[in-house]
From Swiss-Prot:
GO molecular function, one term: methyltransferase activity
Main enzyme class: transferase
Region span, Disordered: 1-22
A biological process term (GO) from this entry: methylation
Sorted UniProt keywords: Methyltransferase, Transferase
Family to which this protein belongs: Belongs to the class I-like SAM-binding methyltransferase superfamily.
Protein name: Probable methyltransferase ltbC
Subunit architecture: Monomer.
Length: 285
């Protein structure tokens, strides 16, 4: 399913550095809050699966079920298929996995009440509230079976330490401006509003069918800091989608340059570190 500009707000693009970051994610790190609820026979959909490292990880938990991963990028799906092939996972039958092009905002090609579990990580946070994420949540709920689980993870806070490096403003703040398309009236990104959005999408928040929790990611050490700085440099090069989105949001070339200098200095600072807080949502249809 092809995507259009109106239904694709993903700002980071699929540069090699970006995809390498996504490939570090695993089911055990990004979906630990969901794993205890997966049954061996479950039919699972992973929305915005990227290079498929989380999706592939679901197969051992749904070893007698089936798993599908969808993404808007045909290129990154090629990596996902390669990951499944490398793990010798079949494409049909019990314990199988397939990857398909799809855009949640353009509607999914699956009938109502199809999946036991729908998972979506680090995707809704790129959708300015309320309309885009609400549309996505409503569509994911549609394809869930009655009693099925929708699980989402999105980042609600990011911090770079020491704070004196000012990367909370330069990196996190500029990223926020890009997602919100420079709208000065926008209140915040989508993740802090997830409980309210789940309620509006039709989940019974007052009946004990919506659970909210948090998780975290920490990056530290010289090698990891340099890796993050290299990613920032790659993403802010001319022609990269992230740089383009920053410019479209009104972020200047001087501000981009300042961000890159701060990122480099942070990477070279002994004992500097990064922490992210994630909103983990579980909801039963």
């Amino acid at each position: 399913m092809a995507s259009t500009g109106q239904t694709n707000n993903y700002k980071q693009g699929y540069s090699s550095q970006t995809v390498e970051t996504q490939q570090t994610r695993r089911a055990e790190s990004e979906a630990a809050f969901l794993l205890p609820y997966i049954k061996k026979t479950d039919y699972i959909l992973d929305v915005g699966c990227g290079p498929g490292t989380i999706t592939v990880g679901f197969v051992k938990y749904a070893s007698e079920g089936r798993t599908i991963g969808i993404d808007i990028s045909a290129n990154v799906l090629g990596r996902a298929k390669a990951a499944a092939d490398e793990a010798s996972i079949p494409k049909e039958g019990p314990g199988s996995i397939i990857f398909e092009e799809g855009n949640i905002l353009e509607g999914l090609a699956y009938p109502d009440n199809t999946f036991d579990i729908v998972f979506c990580a680090h995707t809704l946070g790129y959708m300015p509230p309320p309309d885009m994420p609400l549309k996505a949540l409503t569509e994911m709920r549609r394809v869930l079976k009655p009693g099925g689980i929708l699980a989402t993870r999105d980042t609600i806070e990011q911090h770079f330490y020491p704070r004196s490096m000012d990367l909370d403003r330069l990196w996190v703040g500029h990223f926020r401006r890009a997602v919100l398309k420079g709208d000065p009236e926008a209140e915040d990104l989508s993740p802090p509003f997830m409980p309210a959005l789940f309620r509006r999408a039709g989940f019974d928040a007052d009946g004990g069918k919506v659970h909210i929790s948090t998780g975290s990611t920490v990056f530290s050490g010289a090698t990891t800091r340099q890796w993050l700085a290299n990613r920032a440099e790659s993403q802010l090069q001319p022609g990269d989608p992230l740089r383009r989105s920053w410019l479209e949001a009104g972020i200047t070339e001087d501000e981009i340059h300042e961000t890159l200098l701060a990122s480099k200095k942070w990477a070279e600072t002994e004992d500097a570190w990064y922490a992210a807080l994630h909103c983990d949502m579980l909801a039963w249809k």
